[in-house]
Amino acid sequence: MRRRILSILGSTVLLCGIVAMSATNVSASGKELKQVDGSYLTTEERSTGYTSSPDLRGVHLMDGESTISKAGISRIYAYGATTANHKVKYMATIVYVDRYDEKNDEWGQIDAWVAEDENTYYMSTAKSLKVERGYYYRVHCNHIAGNEYPY
């Protein structure tokens, strides 16, 4: 009889543990990040994106990187880098900085710049920007690398 009671008690504890784990997983998955035009709205200190597909890279381009990070109160740091598979005649990184407009549920461009270089396989560009607090910001880049015009 004692074994039977211990067996039932052990089974009950195991069942309660399984139910508790399941409840924890359900509540954790409820924190979905909102995605707007391919970008997740997050409060992380830093976010980095890379070229997503080998098809987008072409013959010369190996990798493209875009990074945004907090750089103090009311400041962000925007960074873009382009890497080629080999030395190319022309390379450029076009960096766009956008702010999320919650009222219209869309991104609006607040800054952009172009960095160019020749006869290289790597380049990067960065800028620190003063921004208004209370908004979401993102950085995205166009990466160009080639040997013949048009690139």
Segments predicted by a language model, with ranges:
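Solvent-exposed serine/threonine-rich low-complexity stretches and specific carbohydrate-binding patches
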Residues: 95, 106-120
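N-terminal prepro-regions of secreted/extracellular proteins
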Residues: 1-69
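Short, surface-exposed binding/anchoring microloops in extracellular/periplasmic proteins
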Residues: 57-97
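Exposed aromatic-hydrophobic patches
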Residues: 121-131
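Short acidic/polar inter-strand loop motif in beta-rich domains
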Residues: 143-151
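Hydrophobic/tyrosine-rich beta-strand signature of extracellular beta-sandwich/beta-rich modules
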Residues: 139-141
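Solvent-exposed strand-loop boundary residues in beta-sheet-rich modules
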Residues: 101-103, 147
